[in-house]
Amino acid sequence: MLKAAAKRPELSGKNTISNNSDMAEVKSMFREVLPKQGPLFVEDIMTMVLCKPKLLPLKSLTLEKLEKMHQAAQNTIRQQEMAEKDQRQITH
């Protein structure tokens, strides 16, 4: 860097770029170099990507099974109570 700064005063840091035309000249001095081998890194702006929404059930399958079992158990209890009530009415 020191040798390059001695040959080119714009690299020494002593001379500052004062206006846009000088800036354009400095930018034109540098050329773009793409590697022929190895990874190439590209800066990219992160953007939101919309994807298809995944619909989840409000109740899990196991919860639905438990509710069905509970409902069936309540129905059988009601039927048994009705049968006992009918037997009591018949015997009285």
From Swiss-Prot:
GO terms for cellular component: BBSome; ciliary membrane; cytoplasm; cytosol. It is found in: Cell projection, Cilium; Cytoplasm. It holds the Pfam family BBIP10. Keywords: Bardet-Biedl syndrome, Cell projection, Ciliopathy, Cilium, Cilium biogenesis/degradation, Cytoplasm, Obesity, Protein transport, Transport. GO terms for biological process: B cell homeostasis; cilium assembly; eating behavior; erythrocyte homeostasis; gene expression; protein transport; receptor localization to non-motile cilium; Wnt signaling pathway. The keyword Nucleotide-binding does not apply. Residues 13-22 have a biased composition (Polar residues). The keyword Plastid does not apply. The BBSome complex is thought to function as a coat complex required for sorting of specific membrane proteins to the primary cilia. The BBSome complex is required for ciliogenesis but is dispensable for centriolar satellite function. This ciliogenic function is mediated in part by the Rab8 GDP/GTP exchange factor, which localizes to the basal body and contacts the BBSome. Rab8(GTP) enters the primary cilium and promotes extension of the ciliary membrane. It is linked to Bardet-Biedl syndrome 18: A syndrome characterized by usually severe pigmentary retinopathy, early-onset obesity, polydactyly, hypogenitalism, renal malformation and intellectual disability. Secondary features include diabetes mellitus, hypertension and congenital heart disease. Bardet-Biedl syndrome inheritance is autosomal recessive, but three mutated alleles (two at one locus, and a third at a second locus) may be required for clinical manifestation of some forms of the disease. Belongs to the BBIP10 family. Part of BBSome complex, that contains BBS1, BBS2, BBS4, BBS5, BBS7, BBS8, BBS9 and BBIP10. Interacts with HDAC6. This is BBSome-interacting protein 1. The gene is BBIP1.
